[in-house]
Amino acid sequence: MARRARRPRGRFYAFRRGRWHHLKRLRRRYKFRHRRRQRYRRRAFRKAFHNPRPGTYSVRLPNPQSTMTIRFQGVIFLTEGLILPKNSTAGGYADHMYGARVAKISVNLKEFLLASMNLTYVSKIGGPIAGELIADGSKSQAAENWPNCWLPLDNNVPSATPSAWWRWALMMMQPTDSCRFFNHPKQMTLQDMGRMFGGWHLFRHIETRFQLLATKNEGSFSPVASLLSQGEYLTRRDDVKYSSDHQNRWRKGEQPMTGGIAYATGKMRLDEQQYPAMPPDPPIITTTTAQGTQVRCMNSTQAWWSWDTYMSFATLTALGAQWSFPPGQRSVSRRSFNHHKARGAGDPKGQRWHTLVPLGTETITDSYMRAPASELDTNFFTLYVAQGTNKSQQYKFGTATYALKEPVMKSDSWAVVRVQSVWQLGNRQRPYPWDVNWANSTMYWGSQP
């Protein structure tokens, strides 16, 4: 045991490892000695800009020299889908379109940035915008120039699947970017996101919290089941899911009804996992056929389906999902919410930091921001949601269904999700070449004769 000595004016010393160590005076609030914390230290201030010895983490990769924390907070409205039958061919089938109350919230930095995009009359209010917004400042007419945006073109049948949760979200980001609206009046692309955080090389997910509440009754029994999964529990087809960076792409295949077990254009997956992009009106099937049965659908004799996959209410319940009952079926309290918490990257290899902008990138383009060079759209966790009912179609496995309708001035949400998320950016590649070269080339501006 170390020898201790007391000197005048309350100084304490302890002898260990061959020398006397000066100890600070005991604080009277505590029984045992505690180290006095210094809130503002010079070294901590310097390390916020550059840490010469950042150390490593479990897989023996270097930590970034400097970091910045980003926080998101907002609300997600899980609404019923909309249909926009613009042309005459599709208009007659609008009454035969059905959808299911399912949703999928992916925890990745890309979609959180999309959720915090600008609020305009065509981007967020009242539900999702069905098509990509186009902003152009080179037109002769004032109404066609920024910040005005064009609406989706006619003679198209745009739609959005429930995986595009950011279209129904209002998210705040801290720290704020005061120039975001002026730089990106439309939805941000991967290139825009890379340039927005061009000074950072790495990023990591710290924590995300969800609080889900069912808001709409669907019969006498209609709880909303929610299940948080590590990564993407079901297969995600990134290679064909997005066109123009964020717009979903469809495929044509057989109807998901018992009887048509073969395929016409492409094999379909399990019935409960497929969300109809353009749901068919299937006829009664009496025999098993070797080809997909013709169904009435928009501009096609087959059904159009999305690559996205979802879980039914029964599947989520069988996997142990939480239930949230809507008001009227249970009194509203804290236990009325489904609480989910996701921490870290969910990576068993211990890969804490992920690539935001690849090293050595001086001109950020879409090609640099796509996988595998950038991991901006990497899914760390996925929250699957579905509402059950006592009256449902057999192949929907207890999931509530509804008829798709044209847009109205109000949206119909069946669940609300409160979200809080914390991310962190880091870099190991500053100073950039332009940090020095820009100053050298502009330092004499205005002073030369």
From Swiss-Prot:
InterPro entries: Capsid_protein
Entry keyword DNA-binding: yes
Annotated segments matching region DNA-binding: 1-43
Pfam families hit by this protein: Gyro_capsid (PF04162)
GO biological process: endocytosis involved in viral entry into host cell; viral penetration into host nucleus; virion attachment to host cell
Subcellular compartments: Host nucleus; Virion
Induction: VP1 and VP2 are detected 12 hours post infection, while VP3 only after 24 hours.
Top-level division of the source organism's lineage: Viruses
Keyword set, alphabetical order: Capsid protein, DNA-binding, Host nucleus, Host-virus interaction, Late protein, T=1 icosahedral capsid protein, Viral attachment to host cell, Viral penetration into host cytoplasm, Viral penetration into host nucleus, Virion, Virus endocytosis by host, Virus entry into host cell
A cellular component term, taken from the record's GO annotations: host cell
Primary subcellular site in the record, as a coarse category: host cell
GO molecular function, a single term: DNA binding
Region (Nuclear localization signals): 6-47
Keyword Signal attributed: no
Assigned protein family: Belongs to the gyrovirus capsid protein family.
Record note on quaternary structure: Homomultimer (Potential). Interacts with Rep; this interaction relocates Rep into the nucleus.
Role noted for this protein: Self-assembles to form the virion icosahedral capsid with a T=1 symmetry. This very small capsid (25 nm in diameter) allows the virus to be very stable in the environment and resistant to some disinfectants, including detergents. Essential for the initial attachment to host receptors. After attachment, the virus is endocytosed and traffics to the nucleus. The capsid protein binds and transports the viral genome and Rep across the nuclear envelope.
Name used for this protein in its record: Capsid protein
Record organism: Chicken anemia virus (isolate Australia/CAU269-7/2000) (CAV)
